A protein has these predicted regions:
Chain B
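Alpha-helical substrate-recognition element adjacent to the catalytic core
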Residues: 230-232, 236-320, 379-431, 435-439, ...
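Acyl-donor binding region in acyl/amide transferases
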Residues: 476, 482-561
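A short helix->loop->beta-strand "cap" motif at the edges of active sites that frequently abuts
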Residues: 122-128, 277-278, 355-356
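Terminal substrate-recognition subdomain of acyl/acetyltransferases
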Residues: 328, 350, 354-417, 523-593
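Alpha-helical cap/lid subdomain in secreted, periplasmic
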Residues: 18-25, 42, 50-59, 64-207, ...
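Serine-esterase "nucleophile elbow" of acetyl-processing enzymes
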Residues: 1-59
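Short hydrophobic segments within beta-strands
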Residues: 29-31, 132, 234, 283, ...
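Conserved Lys-Pro-Asp/Glu-containing loop-to-beta segment of HAD-superfamily phosphomonoesterases
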Residues: 322-343, 349
């Protein structure tokens, strides 16, 4: 289950990053989405995802943030903290 | 020319790879003490751009020694063409920190473990080894004084890099992947991303992994026929500052100090390339007399007329002139680089001759060499004594063409050349040149097997089952050097001599060399009591000129595959030796087993 679909600008941009990283233009992620919900979301693509998010928002996560993100919602919160 | 090395773009390209039937395959084993998986899509995508299909074996994490030292390992079962060894300085740093004693022997011990891996691979495989060196570490314990402390980490890494180069020089089967160059080029504070080392053992910052992959691919492609053989130069505001037609030979800017120093530096760089064996040609919109004047009259010029193999100055369009240069040199468009300050000319050549490599040059001539260097256009995997003579070979060839034009008949011309040919089994002194010809020849090449130096050595030593021959040609104008390779294998059971490889330098076509060699091959089959000679043709995108090679000599087509491969057979009794104007040097028995 993907939970609530994203609507805000940030959430939309995050979703686009997911679509590019996982090469799936139909992919829709929500705050509750975890790695288990997305095909090919493994430790390698996780790094690709972090690199792509950092580039999109011109931010830099700490090692702990990269490790501890539990779902897309936490990713969005982390982005908001950095650009806010 | 733009090389897109965007990380996510390459990942996307890798997902979209759909190889066409018949795409040549490269078997690459990747071993290292860092995350290797990340490299797979990048290597696949870059090889796909070069029209190769990469089959990649991924070694276990930090499993290089285990795989290399065990003859039964999955590495050797994979039968790789190339073994890529990646060693991260981050991993070296861990070992340095956790060393049991003092660090005075750290570099030497690390090096001997590396050379042991190389030499073990050499015993169990003919694969080419590509060994990375180390990015200089970012840690400083003593500050600048680190370099005065031989056992410090920075001093150890510097020494290790030097020793890797030295040990590789004495082993033709080891090529160096200069990671330190890449890291310095980018800047080490950006190169290292310690987060991703901690989390995933990423070799460097992930966005920079494509640079490492490109370096590896450049090296491998240089062992597979990709080579820049000629640099074509514009003159005004490319090779010197100013316009020769307006400023005159003394008015242009070209001098070692002061005005035109940046052009002087470019010319020095080009002269180094020429000394290395890369041909220089001029393609300029000018009156010919004006264009050559600075070469003859301006003492500031580094390049002399004798450094230029083909000089074309006229008012025709540059694409037509580059085609003339290509014909004169008999090389492929994809082995030519065109340098011109004028964006109009660059775009015209890109449009009309898309295979020619046309680097984008910056507005400021001071940055030309940097822009050219960034592209790594001149990668090579071999170096032979003949390289330095290459410009001379072509210059002498021009004299032959004049002789040909003035001779009463082609036969008379061939006779007047007084050609001498020496055919012999591969010998150790020639192996570098032999491996180079095998790696560079694309057009006159019947099967395009890209043997490594190690393969050539194995064939040389296999006196029972392999007849690996090289031919060297000279004539009254000068020496051509080693210009042809034929590998044949006697099959006593089938009663035939099998030609597995036949390739020649395009410098010596239509001289009768191939006729002479075929005479010798048939003679050799006779001598061994073999009643038949068989051969194979494997088509590539470049060797169309030899599609009918065997038919020319009266071979019958025995087989044709859907992919265009053909097999041919000739009854030796039915062969009439071809008339040639070549005089044999050396003894016939020199090639026999």
């Amino acid at each position: 289950m993907l939970g609530t679909y994203m609507t805000s600008d940030i959430e939309g941009r995050v979703n686009e990053v997911f679509q590019i990283v996982f090469d799936d233009l139909d992919l829709m992620v929500g705050r509750q989405t975890t790695a288990k919900d997305v095909e090919d979301w493994d430790s390698l693509t996780h790094i690709n995802l972090i690199v792509a998010v950092e580039k999109e928002f011109k931010i830099r996560f700490t090692t702990a943030e990269v490790t501890n993100l539990k779902n897309v919602g936490e990713l969005i919160d982390a982005i908001l903290r950095k650009i806010g | 020319m733009e090389i897109n090395l965007d990380y996510s773009r390459l990942l996307k390209e890798a997902r979209a790879i759909r190889p066409a039937a018949g795409t040549p395959t490269l078997r690459i084993a990747l071993l290292g003490d860092c995350a290797l998986q990340q490299f797979l899509p990048l290597l696949r995508a870059l090889f796909c751009r070069a029209s190769f299909l990469a089959e990649i074996h991924e070694g276990g994490f930090d499993g290089t020694e285990f795989a290399a030292l065990n003859p039964e390992s999955a590495l050797y079962r994979f039968e790789p063409d190339v073994i890529v060894l990646l060693n991260a300085v981050q991993c070296l740093r861990d070992k340095y920190y956790l060393r049991p004693g003092d660090a005075s022997d750290f570099a030497n011990e690390t090096l001997s473990r590396m050379t042991r891996v190389w030499d073990s691979i050499r015993r169990h495989s003919s694969a080419q080894i590509i060994q990375s060196n180390f990015a200089a570490p970012i840690e400083r314990i003593y500050g600048n004084y680190d370099l005065k402390v031989a056992s410090s980490l920075p001093a150890s890494v510097a020494r290790l890099n030097l020793r890797i180069s030295e040990e590789a020089r004495s082993r033709s089967f080891v090529l160096v992947n200069d990671v330190e160059h890449l890291a310095s080029w980018v800047g080490r504070k950006d190169w290292f991303d310690e987060r991703f080392w901690t989390l995933a053992k990423s070799f460097c910052a992930p966005e920079l992994l494509p640079l490492v992959a490109k370096n590896i691919v450049d090296i491998i492609l240089s062992t597979r026929g990709r080579a820049v053989k000629c640099v074509i130069l514009d003159l005004d505001n490319t090779l010197w500052g100013g316009i020769i037609g307006d400023d005159g030979p003394q008015g242009i800017q070209i001098s070692a100090h002061g005005e035109g120093e940046e052009f002087h530096r470019l010319q020095c760089f080009l002269r180094e390339l020429k000394n290395r064996g890369i041909l220089l040609a001029v393609c300029s919109k000018n009156e010919h007399a004006n264009a050559i004047a600075p070469f003859e009259q301006n003492p500031g010029m580094v390049l002399k007329l004798s450094d230029i193999t083909v000089f074309v100055a006229n008012w025709d369009n540059k694409a037509a002139n580059i085609e003339r240069i290509r014909q004169a040199l008999n090389i492929g468009f994809d082995s030519m680089v065109f340098l011109d300050d004028n964006p109009f000319e660059r775009n015209l050549v890109r449009d009309m001759l898309p295979e020619v490599i046309v680097p984008e040059l910056p507005d400021d001539p001071s940055d030309y060499v940097k822009a050219i260097s960034a592209l790594n256009l001149f990668e090579t995997s071999t170096r032979a004594a003949e390289d330095t003579q290459r410009t001379e070979f072509y210059r002498v060839e021009a004299q032959r063409q004049i002789a040909e034009a003035t001779a009463a008949s082609f036969e008379e011309f061939l006779q007047s050349l007084e050609m001498k040919i020496e055919v012999e089994r591969f010998v150790p002194e020639q192996l570098s040149r032999i491996a180079q010809l095998l790696q560079r020849s694309n057009q006159f090449n019947l099967t395009t097997h890209r043997y490594t130096h190690a393969h050539c050595e194995a064939m040389m030593n296999d006196t029972e089952y392999c007849l690996p021959l090289s031919a060297s040609l000279s004539d009254r104008f000068g020496d051509h050097g080693l210009i042809a390779i034929v590998v044949a294998r006697p099959d006593v059971v089938a009663g035939s001599l099998e030609i597995t490889d036949w390739l020649m330098s395009c410098r010596v076509l239509t001289r009768g060399v191939e006729e002479y060699l075929m005479n010798r091959i048939v003679e050799e089959a006779h001598r061994r009591g073999l009643g038949r000679v068989r051969g194979e043709f494997i088509p590539t995108s470049k060797n169309g000129m030899v599609k009918d090679f065997f038919a020319r000599f009266g071979f019958e087509k025995a087989r044709e595959d859907a992919d265009g491969r053909t097999e041919w057979a000739l009854e030796t009794a039915a062969y009439t030796p071809r008339h040639v104007f070549l005089q044999r040097v050396g003894d016939i028995s020199s090639i026999g087993a």
